[in-house]
A protein has these predicted regions:
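A glycine-centered beta->alpha junction motif in the catalytic cores
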Residues: 63-70, 114-130, 149, 273-281, ...
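Active-site activation/catalytic loop segments of kinase-like enzymes and analogous catalytic loops
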Residues: 86, 261-331, 353-370
Length: 419
């Protein structure tokens, strides 16, 4: 296909435009008349198509030059597709098997063709439906640890890390969205904000809490300045597809170099929002068991993260940070240094979790966990619990010492009625 001028794909044009790509034809066959093409994208930014035949299946994702959720009044650079591709390449190396296999990439057309994940289901859909996912915590905890460690100055050669950091600074439009929608706009009456009727008293509490807003902005300072590792940038339950045997992480177009705790914090917040939304999705006879399982997933994810991070610390610490020449080679333990790093990561996880819990209820793009609750009175009550716990996490990110304290806090807030 020509790559001279960008043109959005359609169901009608996709086969002709991609039909000459050998790597695609190897999977779905040369006979384009037998390709079944459907548009399946339900996200905020991109076109997504499935291409199926008797031979095989693929996913084709194309960036649009604007935010699909809003329209062409909010332009976005097509280069985000390039950064998504680059993140996927690095994640595939740092945690093999954790992301979809890339079949084809066209930078000018902003197209990525990938393996179709079957019979995988979006994690958020499973959480809303009350489905249990075996091995979820282990797989995602290890993913966060491996990508955080192996993308950092603990592991990479400093020249490679610095050049990669410089390249990803070009993803500034997507970083700008995070800086605005996540860290800033929930805390004032921004133009595109919206929230459920009945939440006004809670919103007033949050937006008048100067100490909390300062803590949120301090986390934004870290987001903009601390290029610790290559982050997925948007690791929510809609960015994970899974079966009981396999978990794949998708959609890293918000990739950037930032705090090591960013991805784990985003993921944790999404588990907490799933937890607080459950009373609207479950019958009373299954509610407690499923909510407890979600909290167990949070605890086990963090345990898996710490265990894997410690393992990599001992086996792959070859970068400029905390070198063995300063510790083990002199007969000194590096355990104190490791614990300091993990404590630093944990504080960021807690703060980011609270901020994202606010963003997903007050800013532009909300979570289906709450949005699919048709009873707005019920929804606002559950969202209020979520918002008030988010406030607690932001304010106390340095005093909540471990994940057990966090999950116990969730149990407490789950019993409160703030409206």
């Amino acid at each position: 296909m020509s790559s001279e001028k960008y043109e959005p794909l359609t169901v009608e044009t996709l086969a002709n435009r991609l039909g000459a790509v050998d790597d695609i034809c190897k999977i779905v066959g040369d006979d384009k008349s037998k390709w079944k093409i459907d548009e399946v994208g339900d996200g905020n930014l991109n076109l997504v198509y499935t291409v199926s035949s008797d031979s095989g299946n693929i996913i084709v994702k194309q960036a649009l030059p604007y935010v699909r959720l809003v329209g062409d009044s909010w332009p976005l650079p097509l280069s985000r597709s390039f950064y998504e591709h680059e993140v996927l390449v690095r994640q595939a190396k740092r945690d093999p098997g954790s992301v979809p296999e890339i079949i084809y990439f066209n930078k000018v057309q902003a197209i990525i063709a990938m393996e179709m994940l079957l019979p995988h289901v979006i994690l958020r859909k499973k959480l809303i439906a009350g489905e249990y996912v075996d091995g979820l915590a282990q797989r995602l905890g290890k993913f966060c640890a491996r990508t955080a460690f192996r993308g950092s100055d603990l592991s990479l050669k400093t020249a490679d890390k610095k050049s990669d950091t410089a390249m990803f600074q070009g993803n500034l439009a997507l970083m700008g969205i995070t800086e605005s929608l996540v860290f800033t706009e929930p805390y004032f009456a921004a133009e595109m904000n919206h929230h459920t009727d009945g939440l006004d008293p809670i919103v007033k509490i949050l937006r008048s809490d100067v100490k909390m807003k300062v803590e949120a902005q301090k986390m934004l300072m870290k987001f903009t300045a601390n290029t610790e590792t290559l982050c997925h940038g948007d690791l929510h339950s809609g960015s994970v597809m899974c079966t009981d045997d396999e978990t794949k992480v998708i959609d890293p177009e918000f990739g950037f170099y930032g705090p090591m705790g960013f991805d784990l914090g985003m993921l944790t917040s999404n588990y907490l929002m799933a937890y607080f939304s459950q009373p609207a999705h479950r019958e009373s006879n299954t509610l407690s068991k499923y909510q407890n399982w979600i909290l167990e997933v949070i605890e086990e994810t963090h345990e898996a993260f710490q265990n894997e991070f410690k393992k990599l610390w001992n086996s792959e610490r070859k970068g400029i940070l905390f070198p063995k020449s300063m510790f083990e080679d002199q007969g000194d333990s590096s355990e104190f240094a490791l614990n300091e790093v993990l404590e630093h990561i944990w504080e960021d996880v807690v703060a980011i979790s609270g901020i994202e819990m606010h963003r997903r209820v007050l800013s532009l793009a909300h979570n289906a966990d709450f949005e699919e609750i048709s009873d707005t009175k019920k929804r606002s009550q559950l969202e209020a619990r979520n918002l008030m716990m988010g406030r607690e996490l932001i304010l106390n990110n340095k005093t909540i010492k471990n994940v057990s304290e966090l999950t116990n806090m969730a149990r407490k807030f789950n019993l409160e009625n703030f409206l």
